[in-house]
Amino acid sequence: HPGTNMVFLCQPNNPTGQLAEPALVEALLRRCEAVGAVLAVDECFLDFLPEGEGLSAKHLLKNSKKLIILKAFTKLYGMAGVRLGYCLCSDTELLARMRAAGQPWAISGLAQAAGIAALDETEYVAKVRALIEAQRPVLADGLRALGLRVIEGRANYLLFRAPEALGEALRRK
């Protein structure tokens, strides 16, 4: 659409957990380039998938200045209070503008140390991924057994639809 400056894509989608195929992400990037828009891809939950690295749009960075990829330590490593994430982009001018618009304080020493330590936790990451792969169908089956409609997804979360009466009952509690 004319006048569009940025398109934002969650990979996997939040709240459905659905994945966009890499070819679709690339086609979306090419369309953004054609109209002068930036494609921002939030890959913060992609790290939970064993095949996440292969689904990342990182390989598209070398040929496009219209791509921003957002990543976070806070999700996979359970460090929400540390507030540590990063942005990948090959457009140095855009990065400079983002840096200038950012918060005036630097990342704390504690956050830096936590991030560096997290990078060495490959065994932890493998265990978390395996646990999610094993427990996602168990949780989905349990929700279905309660009569809830579960939307199949690949993320570490599930979207389900409950009857209106359940929502009303929970609000009253």
Model region roles, listed by residue range:
Residues 27, 31, 59-63, 138, ...:
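Alpha-helical structural signal in soluble globular domains
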